[in-house]
Design a protein with these regions (language model features):
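Active-site regions of metal-assisted phosphoester/phosphodiester hydrolases
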Residues: 1-35, 59-60, 64-236
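Short, flexible, glycine-rich and Lys/Arg-enriched loop motifs at helix boundaries
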Residues: 45-54
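Active-site neighborhood of divalent metal-dependent phosphoester/pyrophosphate hydrolases
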Residues: 12, 39-46
Length: 236
């Protein structure tokens, strides 16, 4: 069993408009996932400083940062970061450009989880529907172009309000799109903006939204998660 999660941390700024990294780190630790995709992990302008430093993450959580950043002060690429348990092997990683009018991107990491090599792709998509479709198409093309196919999980803030939206149809038909629940805004969730998409090698056993008291105030999004099995339920 693998537990994977996604969390738009809004640069560690909570619903009280205060930047409190220790609060965000508490939520990350509460989630207790094997892999966590973060969105808005870095500040948007200037040196793109991380709002959670690798030192803070190491001190306050059981995770380490996949080294995706191109700037010394950052932990991600266009705000997208991936955290994995300290004991986990990071086998490969890559930054992926996405078409858009504003700075957007996705990140990918191949990791070893419970004896399985798994590919994780994390994203934060455009607020404009046309660009969301193009971004998903581009992301899938880049993943399919890789020489080695692996069990794949895609996740993040898709900025898509409707479960039957055209943008979600850009994922292959044999992939499962999971909406764990309403995650935005965190105080009174109305929309399922955060989703988890899995290739056929995975079975989604359970999914949900992390709704702790701290999570309700730490960001404008609540984290989402899913328990995954590799292989069908009948596989011994």
């Amino acid at each position: 069993m693998i537990k994977i999660g996604s969390y738009n941390i809004q640069k560690a700024i909570g619903m009280d408009a205060r930047r409190k990294p220790e609060r965000t780190l508490k939520v990350i630790q509460e989630m207790n996932c094997d892999v966590i995709a973060l969105q808005e992990a870095d500040k948007r302008f200037g040196p793109r400083e991380a709002t959670l430093t690798p030192q803070q993450i190491a001190e306050h959580t059981d995770y380490k940062v996949v080294p995706l950043a191109t700037r010394d002060a950052s932990i991600g690429w266009h705000g997208n970061a991936i955290l994995v348990r300290r004991s986990m092997d990071i086998l490969e990683f890559e930054r992926l450009d996405l078409p858009t009018l504003e700075p957007r991107g996705a990140v990918m990491a191949d990791v070893q989880i419970n004896g399985h090599r798994v590919r994780v792709a994390a994203m934060h998509l455009s607020v404009i529907g046309t660009f969301r479709k193009r971004q998903i198409a581009s992301l899938m093309d880049q993943l399919h172009a890789r020489s080695n196919a692996l069990p794949t999980v895609l996740l993040g803030d898709l900025n898509e309000w409707r479960d039957k939206a055209k943008s979600l149809k850009m994922f292959p038909d044999h992939f499962e799109v999971t909406s764990p629940g309403r995650s935005f805004p965190s105080a009174f969730p109305l929309a399922s903006l955060d989703r988890i998409i899995t290739s056929p090698e995975f079975t989604v056993q359970q999914s949900g939204v992390h709704r702790s008291d701290t999570a309700r105030v730490a960001s404008d999004h609540l984290p989402v998660w899913a328990h995954l099995l590799i292989g069908s339920p009948d596989t011994p």
